[in-house]
Amino acid sequence: MLFRSKLTASLGWAPDRLPIQEQATIVVGNALRLEWASICPPTEDTIVAGNPPFLGPHSRSKEQLQDLQLVWGTKDLGRLDYVTAWHRKSEQYFESTKRGRFALVSTNSVSQGDQVARLFPSLFAAGWRLRFAHQTFAWTSEAVGAAAVHCVITGFDKAEPTPPLLYAYTQVRGEPI
């Protein structure tokens, strides 16, 4: 019961059934071309979390451009980063539910300039609200060839309104305060 209380305090919600039962399903494919609901039907308790690829308009392949066009339903993408396709896919995935949650690591470019005007209005119009956000921070990894980018993390939900949380950083390479 204590664990459930801590989960509720930190996330604002805890699943009814703890411990969580393992159900491994591995699907190999292009996440932007797969129908997510056919793999895992959305429920009001489903959470989508991810760290999709960061690819700006000058660094994606023709296939990735086609993925982005398919998900957004337009060839007029402006400067939308490839990662925005996962925001749109998450929005589409939860269309049949009244609730849902998703959080994604993205390049900080999605929170500035013309990408803001293209990405966020459709989310807000569909009833999504910003639940939490991490301000820009430097991506760190011990992996060989790790991305050298500045990131944000944004979390969205359709739940009852509560004040959104902002995780601020005094330095991009620091810890949130």
Residue ranges and their predicted role:
Residues 1-177:
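Signature of N6-adenine DNA methyltransferases within the class I
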